[in-house]
């Protein structure tokens, strides 16, 4: 009788643990209950098991639907962010309105904080406006998000060259020429950075590569 009562307590404890989401405790109590009284063939525990398994399946399906909804929402936000990026670009190319462009880039980033193109475009706009500190922060964010993104690395190197951070410029422009060896501008700026560091021979080599690439492009 004691074992029978103990089994009832353990089955109840297993059910409570399940309801709390503590699967480890649920299984522990369930196996203890089986050890106390083997009830698997009994209709009542079997119904309990089926009901709880049904809840698991329902939750899995709900979780799947929720993930799909979140994915669709994120996709919509990315699309809206892209539209704001395009509007920001138009503010620069057509209206020459830097403030409006930056506002659009900020809207794009509020919708998708990992939107690398928006960070880069914002950085370039700030750089052209001689706001070098904030521009570098934008490029830093872009590089952190995608260390192998050519535009992010190249533009940060260009900025660092402008702000006399020669060592940083050399590191970035060296990487940029590796990421995109056919980019003449990257080789040219890399040469400029090397010259500032007193490396005339290496600088001349990069300038020569840049000239060859420019000639090749004209052909």
Ranges and model annotations:
Residues 8-28, 32, 79-111:
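Alpha-helical segment of the N-proximal tetratricopeptide repeat
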Residues 62-67, 93-104, 128-141, 163-175, ...:
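Structural signature of tandem alpha-helical TPR/SEL1-like repeats
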Residues 18, 92-93, 120, 127, ...:
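Position-specific recognition of the canonical hydrophobic site in helix A of tetratricopeptide repeat
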């Amino acid at each position: 009788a004691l074992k029978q009562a103990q089994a009832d307590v353990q089955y109840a404890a297993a059910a409570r643990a399940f309801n709390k989401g503590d699967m480890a405790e649920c299984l522990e109590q369930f196996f203890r209950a089986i050890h106390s009284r083997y009830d698997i063939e009994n209709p009542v525990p079997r119904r309990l098991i089926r009901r709880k398994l049904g809840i698991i399946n329902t939750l899995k399906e709900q979780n799947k639907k929720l993930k799909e909804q979140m994915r669709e929402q994120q996709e919509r936000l990315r699309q809206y962010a892209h539209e704001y990026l395009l509007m920001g670009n138009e503010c620069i190319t057509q209206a020459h309105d830097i403030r409006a462009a930056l506002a659009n880039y900020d809207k794009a980033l509020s919708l998708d904080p990992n939107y690398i193109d928006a960070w880069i475009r914002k950085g370039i706009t700030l750089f052209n406006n001689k706001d070098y500190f904030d521009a570098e922060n934008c490029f830093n964010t872009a590089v952190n998000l995608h260390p192998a993104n050519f535009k992010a690395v190249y533009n940060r190197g260009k900025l660092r060259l402008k702000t006399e951070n020669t060592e940083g410029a050399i590191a970035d422009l060296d990487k940029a020429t590796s990421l995109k060896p056919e980019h003449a501008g990257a080789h040219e700026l890399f040469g400029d950075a090397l010259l500032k560091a007193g490396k005339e021979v290496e600088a001349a080599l990069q300038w020569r590569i840049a000239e060859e690439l420019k000639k090749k492009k004209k052909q």
